[in-house]
Amino acid sequence: AAVHDAWLYVPYCWDNTNAAPDNVSSDFNGVRVPYVNWYHDVSNFGAYRDHIYGLMTYNVTDLYQTGVNNTALFAREGTDAKISPAGFTLAVVYEDSSATRKQIFINEEFDILGADQGNYGTSMAEATAYVPFSGAIIDTENVVRANLTTFVPWGNDGEGNLYFNGEQIGTGVWSYGPRAVGASDNPQVAVDEREVTAYLNATGNE
């Protein structure tokens, strides 16, 4: 199989010095790479209203090496800068003409969600992110299996309801593991994967 695409995703938090995107750098396999997309959000409420959370994405297709350990280095510029990355995600899409046909839809964005009327003034309905998928039409009659995989940085234990095409398919979905403050071996990124074949549409999946 040949590599079709390789993308590096770097989520971060605690950026109250506006370090991202221009005062941070990312190297992949020793080569400085520019970010392609930058998504960010801020609560604007409470004690941490000015602490920006975000996601930076990098196209590393030409630098990715199969069969070896690939390395990524994320650094801030300036000793007074405050920015804390979570675990990186490296998504690699392969193509193989001898394999069965696959359709892969990738939607990248970033939102801070918190449902708490007392502390944030937000309801469950307001603290909802919508993720529409666009692309080629799906031949639903011939689909063997469809999986939905979600990545949620700092998704706490028992947190999050998951819907697909209007159907609730999970409750308390995301948990990144033991809570940690400061330097940690925990990637602090919750990953969930589940089958959605029964709810799949030919177009307009969300």
Model-inferred region functions:
Residues T17, V60-Y64, P153:
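Short linear motifs in intrinsically disordered
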